Amino acid sequence: TECPDDTGLVAKITNICYKHQLNIIKNSEFVENETKRFFMRTELNGIFNDETLLTDLKFTLPEGSSYKLLPKQRKRIVILVTKEAHCLGDLLMKNYYGGLDVEIAAVIGNHETLKSLVERFDIPFHLVSHENLTRVEHDKLLAEKIDEYSPDYIVLAKYMRVLNPEFVARYPNRVVNIHHSFLPAFIGAKPYHRAYERGVKIIGATAHFVNDELDEGPIIMQNVINVDHTYTAEAMMRAGRDVEKTVLSQALELVLADKVFVYKNKTIIL
């Protein structure tokens, strides 16, 4: 639920749940102080009549409200890759051993470098090459292949191409990227080399939703590790890869559990 803040909202919503004989398992709420916007996430079990429940919410909540009733079910993702294996490999292993509750429907690459890795896990791999194509032409072919699998989310696991605005608009707040720096520092390419040149003492990674601006989408998860003057750019890169794969999988856990609200180009995690 997302709506203008008002007195007694939690009581009103929970009373509707009680009226429908639904048991509240977990409840989290937050008020954004500047805009007085109320956010609430409630986990329920019981026998649902979606239409009447949503109608009751509509007539109870203030004007300008939005709300969704989401079944607890396994999500589907399509992963996009280029040549780097660490983030993809981590997701494949976690998924295989039950550490990440998701269906990896397919992996799509603009190179075939990671095809053999993916096929070891009996997951389809598709090559959608960008050779001799404009960015718009390539992204159109990419979207067509993605849509064959009807994924809930698209994951950029070190996919090293910038997506065009039309592609991004097709999947609003459904494309998750891992960026190899602690944004907003060192956006774009070769962040570890620039971090080394700057003499930074921490390096990090950022998982975010993709929007029209390069590396400017709503941030879902970040983390850092300490480094010092003894680290070369290559050593920073190796250490950074560990942070990248951890941050990406943690962000996906939140997204797949429907815990992430997007508001004003930032996220609220409940």
Predicted segments, located by residue:
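One-carbon transfer enzymes
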Residues: 30-270
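Short, surface-exposed ligand-recognition loops at beta-strand->loop->(often short) alpha-helix junctions
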Residues: 1-9, 47-48, 81
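Short amphipathic alpha-helix segments
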Residues: 6-26
